[in-house]
A protein has these predicted regions:
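Long compositionally biased, domain-poor regions of proteins
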Residues: 156-161, 185-192, 196, 207-215, ...
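Short, thiol/selenol-centered motifs that function as redox-active sites or metal-ligating centers
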Residues: 44-51, 183-190
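A cross-kingdom feature marking solvent-exposed beta-strand/loop segments within repeated
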Residues: 26, 30, 39, 51-76, ...
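Short, structured motif recognition centered on aromatic/hydrophobic residues
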Residues: 35-43, 73-74, 174-182, 212-213
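Acidic, glycine/proline-rich low-complexity segments that act as flexible tails and inter-domain linkers
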Residues: 1-33, 45-46, 50-54, 61, ...
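Short acidic/histidine-centered micro-motifs embedded in hydrophobic/aromatic stretches
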Residues: 73-77, 92, 96, 179, ...
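Substrate/cofactor-recognition hotspot
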Residues: 81-83
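D/E-rich low-complexity acidic segments and tails
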Residues: 247-254
Length: 271
């Protein structure tokens, strides 16, 4: 946490020291930076001022996350958890970044300059086409029709036409943040979809997803963690997809062998 741990005076404080930081954060299945993304998402959504301040400060002070990356995180978080919560989060980022700069002996400055993404041409139709392509690439399915403001301006024009295409975070990092957000949001379809495509795409492994579930459960509760765990268990990974295809092919071969030549529909047609 980039600060000295206080003495544990309650069962909660002892568990935070011994389990949360003594065990979970030290597990090798995710990098500390990956765990930061899950934790920042959870504390920002939990409306807990103290933990938000502490974890934003620790992420910046440790150097695990740079200020430009933190600001990209705020935008991605806003998409999936809403602008009001993200507005508060960005205010915290500003205050904690100023604190970090002062501690480093630097006069606090404003935000780093923003570059216009190379894909932004000002052409709305090009934005929509880019959004359709990004949606299909991220979600491994065709883009929806742009027949409502939510789908056209929101999903295709902004979420996938802009945010997911931005270079400030890797796609894998956006997956981690999104999985944590949809775990929070109590939306069954986005939860299943984003967990499934994160695994099927190969951006996250099953072992990494299991570690995300544990980190998430610690910071947003084991009840919601169970729902996220169930979604991960039900997801189709590249390995299970290959195993399923092999099993189906083997079963078909066995069936054909047992049926013999007379049982083949193709042979029946030739006769």
């Amino acid at each position: 946490m980039a600060t000295e741990a206080p003495p544990a005076l309650t069962p909660f404080e002892a568990a935070a020291r011994d389990f949360v930081f003594g065990e979970v954060w030290r597990r090798p299945g995710l990098s500390r930076r990956d765990r930061r993304w899950v934790t920042l998402t959870c504390v920002a959504a939990a409306d807990a001022p103290g933990p938000i301040d502490a974890h934003v400060y620790a992420a910046l002070r440790s150097g695990d996350i740079e200020i430009a990356e933190m600001l990209e995180f705020v935008l991605h978080f806003a998409v999936y958890c809403g602008w009001p919560k993200a507005s508060h989060l960005e205010g915290v980022v500003g205050r904690q970044w100023a604190r970090v700069q002062r501690e480093r002996g630097v006069e606090p400055t404003g935000w780093p300059p923003l570059d216009v993404p190379s894909f932004e041409t000002g052409d709305w139709n090009a934005r929509l086409e880019g959004g359709r392509a990004e949606f299909a690439d991220v979600n491994l399915m065709p883009a929806p029709p742009s027949d409502t403001p939510y789908r056209q301006a929101g999903i295709l024009g902004f979420v996938f036409g802009n945010v997911w295409r931005r270079p400030g975070l890797t796609r894998r990092e956006r997956r981690i943040i999104t999985v944590a957000c949809v775990g929070i949001d109590d939306s069954p379809m986005p939860l299943r979809t984003h967990v499934d495509v994160a695994l099927r795409s190969g951006d996250l492994t099953s072992a990494e997803m299991d570690e995300i579930v544990l980190q998430f459960a610690v910071y947003y509760g084991f009840a919601k963690g169970e729902a996220l765990s169930d979604a991960a268990a039900a997801a189709v990974t590249p390995a299970t997809a290959v195993a399923t295809a092999d099993a189906v092919a083997t079963a078909d071969a066995v069936t054909a062998t047992e049926a013999g030549p007379a049982g083949s529909p193709h042979l029946e047609e030739k006769r």
